[in-house]
Amino acid sequence: MAELLLVETPIPQQKHYESKPFPAVISPPSASIPIPALSLPLFTQTIKTQKHYLDSLLHESGAVLFRGFPVNSADDFNDVVEAFGFDELPYVGGAAPRTSVVGRVFTANESPPDQKIPFHHEMAQVREFPSKLFFYCEIEPKCGGETPIVLSHVVYERMKDKHPEFVQRLEEHGLLYVRVLGEDDDPSSPIGRGWKSTFLTHDKNLAEQRAVDLGMKLEWTEDGGAKTVMGPIPAIKYDESRNRKVWFNSMVAAYTGWEDKRNDPRKAVTFGDGKPLPADIVHDCLRILEEECVAVPWQRGDVLLIDNWAVLHSRRPFDPPRRVLASLCK
């Protein structure tokens, strides 16, 4: 089979760090290839043959957006994910309500469209988190609904410069995450995943064992729900592949977004010694995240590959319809 030429394409929303674009954007050569020849099998075959180049690009930039390729369905997206050859990571221990779609593909966080999902590294609050994640736009929103991304080491450096004592405390004590789960999923909440979905079982004994495997403490509540305590776990990690520290946590997400009828966000995350976080510094971190982020409006067929070690992501509110799918990789 012929191989497709991959073209690095500039878009207005990109930022540049050390002369490298963020995110990198890859498109087909629009002028040289007739549209009928631009098939999904050709795209997936090119991914396989150009894997070294794409891995290098992801390592340099932290995120790669594939735009203009014939990825028209969840099945197509699953084929794209499979073409990269990354091992699958089951979604066990995460907070977001999600629905399995096909193969390795499930819905992105299904919280209501008027709610913002704050910046976080995917599953930063558990031991086993994905190293990479894919997003795919099946239905582009009428308005809003971007998935802003931000380079984690940039956030770390800015926080260290502005709040050195706070960062030192984080490095010494880590963070403690507390979440109260219902028995079943609550689609009205951005963290509404019930314990049955969280641990992929209806058996409490098995749920307890899986919690232990994840490093969680699990307590059952009188209403049939559960309380999970995770940590202390590091809030700042060292990215060995890039030789730099990264702001690898869900601090802002938990403190500003883990709120529903069961959860108080101010109690959802604390220093690892249990002491409360200073609200003004948390909100200043949010400001830094917003200043440094890139928000590219989704287009139907877009596939976004994120290095979860390098990049935090979020979701902006939107006017429906919008359907963005996801896949996690070890």
Swiss-Prot record:
UniProt KW Ribosomal protein keyword: no
Is the keyword Oxidoreductase assigned to this protein?
yes
Native source organism of the sequence: Arabidopsis thaliana (Mouse-ear cress)
Which protein are we looking at?
Answer: Clavaminate synthase-like protein At3g21360
Cellular component (GO) terms are: cytosol; nucleus
A GO molecular-function descriptor: oxidoreductase activity
E.C. no: 1.-.-.-
Q: Which residues carry this modification: N-acetylalanine?
A: 2
| Miscellaneous information on this protein | May use 2-oxoglutarate as a cosubstrate.
Quote the record's binding site residues for Fe cation.
120, 122, 313
Q: Which cofactor does it need?
A: Fe cation
Q: Which Pfam families match?
A: TauD (PF02668)
Cofactor binding note from Swiss-Prot or TrEMBL: Binds 1 Fe cation per subunit.
Q: Which UniProt keywords apply?
A: Acetylation, Iron, Metal-binding, Oxidoreductase
Matching Gene3D superfamilies, A to Z?
Answer: Clavaminate synthase-like (3.60.130.10)
